[in-house]
C-alpha cells in the first residue's frame, strides 16, 4: 500500500514548493499524500524521494526504512518534480517538468525506466490517480492542444501511452480524483477556478460554481463521494473549505457547502485510518482537524471541527502516522517539525531541521516509525525517528552532474512517497 498524502490518488506532494521552471516562471505545485493503513504485511519498507535538477536529469533515491540508508538511485528526466503510484501497482511514475516527459519504472526491479513523451511545452508539475488503469498528468505550460491554458494528459498504464490531452485553466497547480465517480478536479491558481474533467469522456465538464476566493488545493474523501477545495480568501482573513458532491454528475460542479478555516490555508490532507481531514493554515500558524466521516451539507457546519492545533511558523505540510497516535506538521517559517497529539491536538515537541533546510515536503512510513522531510535548501532528506522524535540521518541527494567527485552541486529533494 502506497503512502500518499491526499486520498484517492497522489497529487503533487511537493506541498507548495516554489520552483522556477523555464522562462523564469514560478509555479506552486500542490500535492496531497495519502496515508496508508497501518499493519502492513511487508517486512521491508521504503521511501522514494524525487530529486529536482534544473540543469540535467533528475533522479529518485530509494531509502530503506529500517536501515536509514540510500539503497538505489535511478535517473529520471530533466526537472523531476512529482511522483505517484497507481492504485495497487508497483510502478512509480515521475513527472519531469524540464523535458515534458513522464518516467515510469518498477522500483523493486531497479528499472528499466520507460520515458513517456508529452506534448512539447507541457511542463508537467503534478500527477496522480485513484485508478490502476490510468495516470493523470497536470501540465502548467501551453502546448499544441491547449495553446493558451494548462492541460491534463491521460496515460494508459497498460501501454504507457498518452491517450488524450484536455484543456483546463491558467496556472493549474493541484488535482484530485474521486474514486467513486472518477471525476478529476484541477485547481487553477492563475484564474481562481476549479476545472472538472470526466475521464470517461474524455471531456471537460466545466468549472465549479460557488467557489470561495483563491482556491489553492484539492483533496478527495476516503469514499470518493466528496471533494474538498481549500480557498484562501483575500489572504488577510479566514479561508474556507468548499465541499463538492462528486458522487454524481448532477452535483459535481457545484459547491454543496462551505466551512470556515484559519488564516491563509494552503493544503489539506486526508487520513483514511481515522477518517479525518487536516488543513494547514499557513498564515495563522495552525492546523484545523475535521471529522471527514460525518459530511452532510444540510448540517451546520457541514463537517464537524474536531479541534485546532497551534504549530510552528508557516505550516506547509502534514503527515499523520498510520497508527493514529500523532501527526507531524512541517513548518517552513520556523524551519522545524511540530509533533502533535492526534487525541488532544496539543503540540508535544518541535524537531529542529538543519540550518538552511528550506523544507518543502513531509511523509511518514506505514509502520509509523519514521518521518521524512525533503530539504530543498540543503539538498538532503531528513529522517526523524518517531519513538523519540530525534533526527537519525540527513541523506544527501545525488550530484547534479553524474560522476562529479569534487565541489559537486547536489540535486534538490522535492517529494516523498513511502510503502
Where does each model-flagged region fall?
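Bacterial N-terminal signal peptides that target proteins for export
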Residues: 1-11
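Predominantly soluble domains enriched in secretory-pathway, periplasmic, or organellar proteins
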Residues: 23-419
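Bacterial N-terminal signal peptides
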Residues: 10-20
